[in-house]
From Swiss-Prot:
Keywords: ATP-binding, Ligase, Nucleotide-binding, Purine biosynthesis. It comes from Halalkalibacterium halodurans (strain ATCC BAA-125 / DSM 18197 / FERM 7344 / JCM 9153 / C-125). Pathway: Purine metabolism; IMP biosynthesis via de novo pathway; 5-amino-1-(5-phospho-D-ribosyl)imidazole-4-carboxamide from 5-amino-1-(5-phospho-D-ribosyl)imidazole-4-carboxylate: step 1/2. PANTHER family: MULTIFUNCTIONAL PROTEIN ADE2, SI:DKEY-6E2.2. InterPro entries: SAICAR_synt/ADE2_N (IPR028923), SAICAR_synt_PurC (IPR033934), SAICAR_synth (IPR001636), SAICAR_synthetase (IPR050089), SAICAR_synthetase_CS (IPR018236). Belongs to the SAICAR synthetase family. This is Phosphoribosylaminoimidazole-succinocarboxamide synthase. Pfam families: SAICAR_synt (PF01259).
Length: 237
């Protein structure tokens, strides 16, 4: 397997073509961003941490019957994935009120939800990735009704699996963002990454933050928080 030309570069990853049809080479970056790219920094070791954590979580989800684009870990900062066409929606699952939801509805951060809340955000940097309803999604033609129904089911399946996974390492899964893609034959796969960049992760006993809020809100050292998550996962394995 060889890495060929750069296909796409985003805020946190570079994606390259390979010499095998349908497979892409992902290289994680040390960059950290928040507030739609308004806050930026380069953090040594972040690429390794996100790649290692995401690789381990995707492998766990596969064991739980959740299909994703992840094929295998290639190095500390690289992984191999199936090529998919990304559905332009971020699917956010919330178990505890935090972040923008707390501001939007005026309920104190940290309040548990009686059942998981699934939200959709339209992936458009110029618009600031706005919260959208299913009717908005239809108007935007971002996904079909059938696809939206599938995304909701898959999001709850992932939430059930990850809630158990993180509880096993003493971490509360507050909320998280998922992305999905469509394969050439029409299958919908979990895509992007699952890491402290995309999840709010609090220590189950102390409430200590181990996620990107450390950077976003200047709450502490991001590298230390992510390292704590990786260490706990590796100790459990």
């Amino acid at each position: 397997m060889e890495k060929h030309d750069l296909l796409y570069e985003g805020k946190a990853k570079k994606i390259y073509r390979t010499d095998e049809e349908g497979l892409l080479w992902v290289e994680y970056k040390n960059s950290a961003t928040a507030f739609n790219g308004e806050k930026k920094a380069s953090i040594e070791g972040k690429a390794r941490l996100n790649n290692e954590i995401s690789s381990l979580i995707f492998s766990y989800l596969k064991e739980q019957g959740v299909d994703s684009h992840f094929v295998k870990r290639l190095s500390e900062t690289e992984q191999l994935i199936h090529q998919v066409t990304i559905i332009p929606l971020e699917v956010v699952v919330r178990n505890v009120i935090a972040g923008s939801l707390a501001k939007r509805i005026g309920i104190e951060e940290g309040t548990p939800l009686e059942k998981p809340l699934v939200e959709f955000y339209y992936k458009d940097d110029d618009l600031g990735d706005p919260l959208v309803t299913e009717d908005h999604i239809a108007i935007l033609q971002a996904a079909t009704k059938e696809q939206v129904d599938i995304l909701k089911v898959k999001a709850i399946e992932v939430n059930d699996a990850l809630t158990t996974f993180f509880a096993g390492i003493g971490v509360k899964l507050v909320d998280f963002k998922l992305e999905f893609g469509v394969t050439a034959d029409g299958a919908i796969l979990l895509a992007d990454e699952i890491s402290p960049d995309t999840c709010r992760l609090w220590d189950a006993k102390t409430g200590e933050r181990f996620d990107k809020d450390l950077f976003r809100r200047n709450l502490g050292n991001l590298q230390d928080g992510y390292e704590q998550i990786l260490t706990r996962i590796e100790q459990k394995a």
